[in-house]
C-alpha cells in the first residue's frame, strides 16, 4: 500500500521532467538533412577489412552532410517506392528508432523525411553511457525498439527480432564509419 504513492509520485515527477523538456524542444526547429551521398566511400570488402571499434573521439562536430550519410547508411530509406530501409527488419516492422544526441539537443531521426525532429533541447550525450568518452564524442546514436509496431510477434520474438534489427543498423553504421575513417563504438554499458 505504501509503494503506490511513491510510484505515482515518481511517475508524476518523470512526466513533469519530460513535459518540461518537450516544451524546451519547441524552440528548436527540425533539421532537414541534405540528400545522402550514395556514391562515396570505400568498397565493401575494404570497409570490412578496416572495420574496428574505437573509444577515442575527436570532439569536433560532424559536418551535416556526414551526419546525413551516416544516418541514411544506418537505417535510411533506400527504396522510395516501398519505404524499405538500408537495414532489414523482422516482418518489415521497422520498429527501431534512432535518437541522435548532439551537443545542442536530442533529436529523432525520421527516415521518411530524412530529417532530425527535436525532442529535448539539452546535451544528453553524457547521460547515454557510463564511460568517460561518451561526453566527448560529437554525437551518440541511441537505438530504441517500439514493440507496439510488432503486433503479430510474441513477447519473446519481439526481444529477439528487435535485438537483431538493432544489430543490423549498428553494423551498417560501423561499415559506413570504416569506409569514411570515422571512430565508432557500440556500447551496452548504459543505465537501464
Please state what every model-predicted region is.
Residues 51, 70, 98, 139-150, ...:
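Small-aliphatic-rich amphipathic alpha-helix that forms the alpha element of a beta-alpha
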